[in-house]
Design a protein with these regions (language model features):
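N-terminal membrane-anchoring alpha-helices
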Residues: 1-57
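Short gly/ser/thr-rich secondary-structure transition/capping motifs
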Residues: 53-61, 129-130, 186-188
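Thr-Gly-centered strand-to-loop micro-motif
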Residues: 61, 97-99, 120-122, 150, ...
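Catalytic core of membrane glycerolipid acyltransferases/transacylases, capturing the structured
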Residues: 21-40, 52-53, 68-125
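Generic preference for hydrophobic
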Residues: 60, 74, 96, 204-206
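Glycine-rich helix-loop-beta junction characteristic of Rossmann-like nucleotide cofactor-binding loops
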Residues: 62-67
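Non-catalytic C-terminal accessory region of glycerolipid acyltransferases
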Residues: 130-249
Length: 249
């Protein structure tokens, strides 16, 4: 019952913030081509979502590694839809890359459109990569970062699986740094019966960026492997630390 009421509250909040985002887009567009205002409204909505349940906890590690003046290609491990709001805890203006089907989701799809996120058709690989690079470079040139799930789909077992080349190709083409981010705890926030886990803990760990010079120097497959190994190691460290804290209790 409590979960149902919270879902209803979220629908009302999303409706309100969708209207505010549409107004902000119209009013601010002439001097805010990077849609920073719309992004900040999304961050406020996310903070309300995570703040209201009193026993939810979110921890961000490595925030100091981010240079807010830079544009990054952000790569994140993917477990569930909750990964998307969780990333809004990092202090960057970014655009998501998402498959076409997600843009058709009620409320969520409209938010993606207002936010200016990048829509790709995974059924057409070459065209999807071309659009990713074209639109990604456009947003990076406007001062925004681009966030991508390099696995291309959700992990069923919570582990980080093989990466696809899109994010790394974009970073090379745009001359951008790669910012790896590891998420843990998002998979357990919503139970299989769609009820919320009211005692959930989420960790967002930011890893040191891969400099643009190294991005350019490495072959794409080498870059993918390096970032994959770093993210797997970091995820293991986050989970081991969580187990130690649990044992101490």
């Amino acid at each position: 019952m409590l979960s149902a009421l919270y879902y209803l509250l979220l629908v009302l909040l999303c409706t309100l913030f969708m209207i505010l985002s549409a107004l902000a887009l119209v009013v601010c567009y002439p001097f805010d081509r990077g849609r920073r205002t719309v992004h900040e409204l999304s961050r406020i909505l996310v903070r309300i979502f995570f703040f209201l349940p009193p026993f939810w906890r979110q921890r961000v590690i490595g925030r100091e590694l981010i240079d807010r003046k830079k544009s990054y290609v952000i790569v994140i491990n993917h477990n569930t839809v909750i990964d998307i709001p969780a990333l809004y805890y990092i202090p960057l203006n970014f655009r998501w890359v998402s498959k076409r089907e997600v843009f058709k989701t009620p409320f969520f799809g409209q938010f993606l459109l207002l936010h200016g996120d990048i829509c790709i058709d995974r059924g057409h690989g070459a065209e999807a990569l071309e659009q990713l690079v074209r639109d990604g470079k456009k947003w990076i040139s406007r001062g925004a970062s681009v966030a991508i799930f390099p696995e291309g789909t959700r992990s069923k077992d919570g582990e980080i699986h093989r990466f696809k080349a899109g994010a790394f190709t974009l970073a090379k083409e745009a001359g951008a740094e790669i910012l790896p981010v590891v998420l843990d705890g998002t998979k357990t926030l919503i139970k299989k019966n769609l009820a919320f886990n009211w005692g959930n803990r989420i960790t967002v760990r930011v890893l040191p960026p891969v400099p643009a010079e190294r991005v350019a120097a490495l072959e794409t497959h080498e870059l993918m492997q390096e970032v994959h190994e770093r993210m797997c190691t970091a995820l293991g460290e986050v989970r081991n630390e969580k187990l130690k804290v649990k044992d101490q209790k």
